[in-house]
Amino acid sequence: PESLQFAVRHFILASAILLSKQKNQSRIHTHMVIHAFREVEKHSIIYNWVANYIETIKGSIEDSLSGESNDAFVLFFDTYNKCFTDDVKQNSPFDKHLLQLMSDVLDNIGIALHNGKDQGTRDSIKFKSHQIYIGAQLLERGITFDRLLTTYFTRWPRSDGNMDTNLQRARWFGYRLKYAELIKLFTTETIADEFSFLAEM
């Protein structure tokens, strides 16, 4: 769906902007979590879709950097304008320098299944600096992701009042104030309301 495409673009942009703020870029690691379905089979479908979409984005950025087109600017313009504050945009303008950093992110990005049938995908990305995890139940067990910039979270437990699970999910959010302006959570109104309720307890 377009919402997931938008979230992937946000992750690439946010990672590039974070890189632009750091002197030692080789030490920067960022994470994205996709939590949309419980069924393991659907995780593989999402994995393949995200992998293909990232390859499409790579081609657009390469063409834009070489001057063959402005496809990447068109593709990311709306995401950049909607996701970041004026202060962020002032310090990290959407220009060729940022586009090059986005290309660097894509060159060092990895996707992994985080479930009981991960097929070795987690081992394959352990040396990647920018990691996207796709899963369900294993992501509910209190894992904290450092520099979690983008969360795509559309699955909610069918049973009401699952307080322990919901609070464990909240532990994903290893957020820090020093990059809070780059963080986005993509979710449904129902889930947002539930977490707001938990936060007020």
State what each model feature region is.
Residues I111-D193:
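Conserved RecA-like P-loop NTPase helicase motor core
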Residues A192-M201:
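Long, hydrophobic alpha-helical segments
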